[in-house]
Amino acid sequence: AYAKRMADIQIRAYREQYGVNYISVIPTNIYGPNDNFNIDNGHVVPSLIHKCYLAMKNNHPFYVWGSGKPLREFIYSEDVAKLTEWALDEYDEKEPIILSTSDEISILQN
């Protein structure tokens, strides 16, 4: 999160100082084809899929780290690609654009 904030500050400074049309695009939790299914450092959705697969394969219970209650927003990787193309062509604001579905769900939500 800190790196994203710092990148946004840098982009704003470049826009102001050099007059370039840089924008800040911030996606929420991404999932999709060719994702990182590593349990330790992958994204939320593929990590959970891999954890569930291993639990079923080894006939072990499936556990989720933490309470599973925090609300998160997820977005499909191909939607991120389309929205990024749109932002490059159409978006010209100094405020960052957050790519999100605006649907908040918890990991425990049915």
Give residue spans per PLM region.
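Glycine/proline-rich active-site loop of Rossmann-fold NAD(P)-dependent oxidoreductases
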Residues: 30-47, 57-61, 77-78, 86-99, ...
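Active-site Tyr-X1-5-Lys
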Residues: 1-28, 44-58
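Ca2+-coordinating acidic residues in Ca2+-binding motifs
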Residues: 26, 79, 109
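Hydrophobic residues at beta-strand termini and immediately following loops
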Residues: 25, 64-65, 99
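Conserved cofactor-binding/catalytic machinery of classical short-chain dehydrogenase/reductase
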Residues: 6-7, 76-79
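Catalytic Tyr-x(3-8)-Lys segment
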Residues: 66-70
